[in-house]
Amino acid sequence: MRKMSILHAAGALARAMLLVTWLPLAAAQAAEIRIGFANGSSADYAPAFAAEKLGSFKQAGLDVRLIAFRGGAAAQEALTAGAADIIAYFGPAVALAVSKGVKEKMVATILAGHSGWNLIVPTDSPARSLKDLAGKKIGISTKASTSDMAALWIGEQAGISMTQIPLGAGALIPSLRSHQVDAIVFSALLTMREMLAGRARSLMDVGATMPATMANVYVASEDMLVNRAGELRAALAVIYKTLAYMKANRAWSMSYLKDFAKSDSDELTAALYDGIFPKLSPDGHIETAWIAEGLTLAARAWEVPELAKVKADTLYTNEFHPAAP
């Protein structure tokens, strides 16, 4: 009887120890990390979504939910409202949010420059150079956007004035095809697809010429920065580890990217992979100069001169990206 009691006691102790061991892990896994994106098809975001497909977040003990919003502004609104913990956004817009009292910081670079961006015109357009667009209509997604900034920069470089027409991302290509605008400036997927299909040609490879303005960056809420630093660091580590995997495994990445980016040809998929992936930050490191350049340009493009006075080094931290000690 005494032996049986000892066995029961030992079993109870073992179960108790197992429970004590399991509880902290369960608590750590219970908190969901919500990561928001401007869309669910940009090649810039593919590593995060690939990590989800590969089960890498779960393997790291993280409960991550990826959310594709309708535009970066919607993602920012979600973070402001506490409906997202991390978002992918662009530097000047982060500064604008912070200037309005939102508590957030940039934590890891996705793409500092504008790789894949092009200024395109219809194939039958008489425009052969930027000078030919003087006084013409250029389609952009929205005001206070990256395309808005790019259009201003292009005009300044060419010494011309163009009329910017905010169309929404979904209307850019239809408006160009119907000649409602003379040109558009936008990111890789839309512009490359039109060029490869022979419906448009590029007057400027924006990605190769425009200076880095912190075009795409992970941004974390104050709660993540202060109260969930370990989870933030772990989530970013998974994303950048997946990026390294995708860079080292072209065949798998091409197959995944074709479906993710809704690419309609192997040629377009290859253009996205070869044109963008080598430029994606391998470790998330942030440079103050990238942010400062974006603030200066946005202050003019958006007619918000206060942005030029914001101290770039107050908007980010390199404490959490995978290369940080």
Q: What residue ranges belong to the model's regions?
A:
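Predominant activation on well-ordered alpha-helical scaffold segments within soluble catalytic domains
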Residues: 49, 95, 152, 192, ...
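N-terminal secretory signal peptides that target proteins for export/translocation
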Residues: 1-12
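Pocket-lining segment of extracytoplasmic ligand-binding domains
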Residues: 92, 125, 170-261
